Design a protein with these regions (language model features):
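Sec-dependent signal peptide cleavage junction
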Residues: 1-9, 73
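Mature N-terminal segment immediately following signal peptide/propeptide cleavage
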Residues: 6-38, 61
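Alpha-helical scaffolding within the catalytic cores
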Residues: 9-14, 51-57, 237-244
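Short, well-ordered coil/turn segments that N-cap beta-strands
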Residues: 25, 66, 102-106, 158-159, ...
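Enzymes and membrane/adaptor proteins characterized by extended Gly/Ser/Thr/Asp/Glu-rich
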Residues: 32-49, 58-192, 211, 216-230, ...
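Histidine-centered catalytic micro-motifs
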Residues: 209, 241, 256
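Oxyanion-binding "anion nests"
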Residues: 246, 251-261
Length: 261
């Protein structure tokens, strides 16, 4: 039988890229439109990317983007009764644009945590959220939830999920984490969060441990202001427990928090 040639190594790919392409790989952003060639939101895309960039595909090509992040407010899809076929077609179109530009696969990401932060709605599976998962204390259930999240996102052409939340929920007045957190027990967060990560990544989708080094003690919504956490090093070490477990378990990505520690 014919022997298939080995894929190029990262070093071989980098050797063929110019400086602009290398810089572009560091950029992950949103694009407007529900298809790669959608011109409906040309003015929105031009406001971000400049003249001549009217479609999502043009943005990927011009700036050699490393990744895109899907949002319903960017008109990539509707969060209610999501047309999954169109989302998959959008992903395929953007990957084709990336391949034509430099043959480097595009990172396509989303915040699909389950619970209150679930960008894709029905027919995707709707989960009750991490606090409910934490109440079960069941690692097998956490792994299964991760599997479902990974499987469904992969079917949409999404290859990285900005989940799970590994914040230790030590502040009951936290306005932005709350139900998104598994528990106020760092060891339980580590166990169930680690299981979620393994479940997501078992489906060929990268999981993301967030929000490093821990957003669970904040009292400000980081989307509206800059939270400051002033706990001791001993307390910080407790917030780091789930992230250490995730790193040792081989999590693909880590998202930093918008906080001052």
């Amino acid at each position: 039988p014919k022997v298939q040639a080995a894929e190029q190594t990262p070093e071989q790919i980098l050797a063929k890229m110019n400086l602009d392409q290398k810089v572009g790989q560091l950029l992950w952003t949103h694009v407007y439109g529900d298809s790669a060639d959608d011109t409906t939101y040309a003015s929105d895309n031009q406001a971000i990317f400049g003249p001549g960039v009217s479609t999502p595909a043009q943005a990927v090509k011009k700036y050699h983007l490393g990744g895109v992040l899907y949002f319903n407010w960017a008109h990539n899809f509707s969060s209610e009764n999501t047309d999954v076929t169109k989302v998959a077609a959008l992903s395929n179109g953007l990957q084709a644009a990336a391949k034509a530009d430099g043959n480097v696969p595009l990172g396509i990401t989303i915040d699909q945590e389950g619970g209150m932060v679930s960008r894709v709605g029905a027919p995707a599976t709707i989960f009750p959220g991490n606090m409910a998962l934490g109440a079960t204390g069941n690692q097998a259930l956490a792994y299964s939830q991760g599997q479902v999240l990974g499987c469904e996102m992969r079917s949409l052409g999404i290859n990285a999920d900005f989940a799970p939340v590994l914040d230790v929920n030590t502040n009951p007045n936290n306005p932005v984490i709350g139900l998104r957190a598994i528990s106020d027990d760092p060891n339980l967060v580590a166990q169930l969060g680690g299981a979620q990560i393994q479940g997501i990544q078992s489906q060929g989708v990268s999981a993301t441990a967030k929000h490093f080094p821990g957003h669970g003690d904040a009292d400000t919504d980081s989307h509206l202001g800059l939270p400051r956490v002033t706990y001791s090093r001993q307390v910080l070490n407790q917030h780091l427990v789930p992230f250490k477990t995730a790193i040792n378990g081989g999590v693909d990505m880590i998202m930093t928090a918008h906080i001052v520690v």
